[in-house]
């Protein structure tokens, strides 16, 4: 059962890697879109394996939007909040982290005395050889959020029939989140 939908198909549009991970974990019948995250797609197993050999004591924390070959090398796979929690709870002092680089600051803040190294990116689309930088995530900040909330012209108008149909999956996501605590 996935999201309370027994025997239902579900489409995952954001990341084929995340969808593949969910499919392998749950056995759910998922329709996977060909999309991916530009950061997570750039992590490569062979490059991560080289870094693991340099730091055999390291625990590897991987976001599930990464390719399956990278996930296979992980000690922990999880959302950013799950990776932060794992870093706090695991009895290791050295971590290799395969997700957007911004998470490293939060990890260092919440677990002083532990070392965090960004997993290297290696693909053609990488913004640099060893950084997992998402330019779009950096566009969102508190000042811009406040500006949008204060602005009078930022309303989005949706046709009522579309709103009614769109409310169903949103209500399911909220209900699922409430069930999970």
Set out the residue ranges of the language-model regions.
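C-terminal functional extensions of proteins
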Residues: 39, 64, 82, 91-92, ...
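Short, well-ordered alpha-helical microsegments
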Residues: 19-20, 48, 70, 84, ...
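Glycine- and Gly-Pro-enriched alpha-helical subdomains that act as flexible
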Residues: 42, 49-60
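Short active-site oxyanion
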Residues: 8-9, 56-59, 90-95
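Single conserved hydrophobic/aromatic residue that forms the stacking wall/gate
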Residues: 1-7, 11-12
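Donor nucleotide-activated moiety binding/catalytic core segment of transferases
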Residues: 75-91
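Active-site glycine- and acidic-residue-rich loops that bind
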Residues: 13, 38-44, 96-98
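Glycine-rich phosphate-binding "P-loop"
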Residues: 35-36, 62-80
């Amino acid at each position: 059962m996935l999201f309370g939908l027994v025997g239902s198909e579900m489409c995952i549009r954001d990341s084929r890697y995340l969808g593949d991970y969910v499919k392998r974990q749950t056995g759910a019948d998922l329709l996977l879109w060909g999309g991916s995250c530009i950061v997570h797609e750039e992590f490569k197993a062979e490059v991560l394996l080289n870094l693991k050999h340099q730091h055999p004591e390291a625990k590897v924390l991987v976001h599930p939007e990464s390719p399956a070959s990278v996930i296979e090398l992980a000690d922990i796979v999880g959302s950013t909040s799950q990776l932060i929690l794992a870093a706090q709870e695991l009895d290791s002092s050295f971590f290799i982290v395969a997700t957007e680089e911004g998470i490293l600051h939060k990890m260092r803040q919440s677990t002083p005395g532990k070392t965090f190294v960004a997993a290297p990116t290696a693909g053609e689309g990488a913004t640099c050889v060893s950084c997992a930088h998402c330019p779009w995530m950096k566009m969102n900040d508190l000042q811009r959020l406040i500006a949008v909330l204060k602005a009078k012209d930022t309303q989005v108008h949706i046709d009522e029939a579309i709103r009614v149909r769109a409310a169903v999956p949103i209500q399911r996501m909220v209900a699922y989140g409430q069930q999970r605590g």
